[in-house]
Swiss-Prot record:
Primary localization class, coarse: cytoplasm
Modification sites for N6-(pyridoxal phosphate)lysine: 228
Any matching Pfam family: SHMT
Function: Catalyzes the reversible interconversion of serine and glycine with tetrahydrofolate (THF) serving as the one-carbon carrier. This reaction serves as the major source of one-carbon groups required for the biosynthesis of purines, thymidylate, methionine, and other important biomolecules. Also exhibits THF-independent aldolase activity toward beta-hydroxyamino acids, producing glycine and aldehydes, via a retro-aldol mechanism.
Domain of life of the native organism: Bacteria
UniProt record similarity statement: Belongs to the SHMT family.
CDD domains according to UniProt: SHMT
Gene expressing this chain: glyA
Name of this chain's protein: Serine hydroxymethyltransferase
Length: 440
């Protein structure tokens, strides 16, 4: 990643990239949806693949000269299928939101009912939020967590499904720290004749390595991002454990008559030309590299350490008097309720930023504050683990966070943040992010 040419060609963009490199190198990244890709992934994403238009799919492109981008996409698809032990993979979605849109558009018509996890309880915008297409085009209903436990009660999910009779049920979240009961969700979906979709954008790496429940045998369709715990480039993907005939009865003409189209055909057509045109072949090349990395034994060791680090952080937070929604974590993240600390998520995010620690403010279940203020914040262990930090460092980081929050009302808070920032920087120096380029 040598930027000498860029430095001379466009000093302003170069300066922004260099400053971002320094930020990532010298601060602690705890945003649960962020991670650090390898140099190999970045080289693939910065390659000549960016020059090629390739509308369509390998072997069936609308442009010529696609024989080598076909190789990259086939590698990405084959590796994804091997990684998740599934029969179908579409690696073209530009994002997790695009993947979700393609699935919802495939199975639902405008006005159909969908049932998803409440955004304010830890869900995602694309699961029915009224500010998103999923809540504007569809009749969206929600299930959430129980106030007493912070966990999803499957009996309540079943009651809601029977009440609203959705066409599609979505399981998955952006801020839920527990594993998902996919088999039970499937039983409920079958009872109301609904399609079941799992959005595993956050725990995908833990699922791929067998550390969390596998949605593939139970969910009709699975979507994910390719960054976060998968540690690849920013993008999306659609998977199916097993292809099947579409339940809407959409047919294709054959030489001898008609046949029911497979769901894979509908999904492929919805991704392109339905919602996208040309795929980002440089990103797909990066996805192929990342999936190859995830198939190595070292990746499972990494994911095991992510889980250990998250558990250590949760334990330390609890020992210091913090409330974690659901009382702990099964995956890489946790959601901290700050209402007993008399500080907002917004203020916490800002103060920690001053201290060299990046988190995001986050609504907690039954929050009485706006999404721009919030009563909580979210923490994830994936990025710090990529730096090879372990449980001891995880607990130290929580102590840094507590030092800032506990002194938030102090007249000396700026000086305290600076002290913590120096400690953070010293810790980061012990665990360098990249060894192929200096940080300044």
């Amino acid at each position: 990643m040598h930027l000498d040419i860029l430095k001379n060609a466009d000093p302003e963009v170069y300066a922004a990239i260099q400053s971002e490199l320094e930020r990532q190198t010298d601060t602690l990244e705890l945003i649960a949806s962020e991670n650090f890709t390898s140099r190999a992934v970045m080289e693939a994403c910065g390659s000549v693949m960016t020059n090629k238009y390739a509308e369509g799919y390998p072997g069936k492109r609308f442009y010529g000269g696609c024989e080598f981008v076909d190789v990259a996409e086939d590698l990405a698809r084959d590796r994804a299928k091997k990684l998740f032990s599934c029969e179908y993979a579409n690696v073209q979605p530009h994002s997790g939101s695009s993947a979700n849109m393609a699935v919802i558009f495939t199975f639902c018509k405008p006005g159909d009912t969908i049932l998803g996890f409440d955004l304010s309880h830890g869900g995602h915008l694309t699961h029915g939020s009224p500010v998103n297409f999923s809540g504007q085009f569809y009749n969206a209903h929600f299930y959430g967590v129980e106030k007493e436990t912070g966990r999803i009660d499957m009996n309540r999910v079943e009651e809601k499904a029977k009440e609203v009779k959705p066409k599609l049920i979505i399981c998955g979240a952006s801020a839920y720290s527990r594993d998902w009961e996919y088999a039970e969700f499937r039983r409920i979906a079958d009872s109301v004749d609904a399609i079941l979709m799992a959005d595993i954008a956050h725990p995908a790496g833990l699922i791929a390595t067998g550390l969390l429940n596998d949605p593939m045998p139970h969910c009709h369709v699975v979507t994910t991002t390719t960054h976060k715990t998968l540690r690849g480039p920013r993008g999306g993907m659609i998977l199916m454990g097993k292809d099947f005939e579409n339940p809407m009865g959409i047919k294709a003409k054959t030489k001898t008559g008609e046949r029911i189209k497979m769901v894979s055909e509908l999904l492929d057509a919805m991704v392109m030309p339905g919602i996208q045109g040309g795929p980002l072949m440089h990103v797909i090349a990066g996805k192929a590299v990342a999936f190859g990395e995830a198939l190595n034994p070292e990746y499972k060791q990494y994911m095991e350490q992510v889980r250990k680090n998250a558990a250590a952080m949760a334990e330390q937070f609890i020992s210091l008097g913090y409330d974690i929604i659901s009382g702990g974590t099964d995956n890489h993240l946790m959601l901290i309720d700050l209402r007993n600390k008399d500080i907002t998520g917004k203020k916490t995010e800002n103060l920690l930023h001053e201290a060299g620690i990046t988190v995001n403010k986050n609504m907690v279940p039954f929050d009485d504050k706006s999404p721009f203020v919030t009563s909580g914040f979210r923490v994830g262990a994936a990025a710090m683990t990529t730096r090879e930090m372990k449980e001891a460092e995880a607990k130290t980081i929580v102590k840094f966070i507590d030092k800032v929050i506990s002194n938030a009302g102090s007249e000396n808070i700026s000086a305290i943040c600076q002290e913590v920032k120096e400690e953070v920087n010293a810790l980061c120096q012990q665990f360098p992010l990249y060894d192929f380029v200096p940080a300044s």
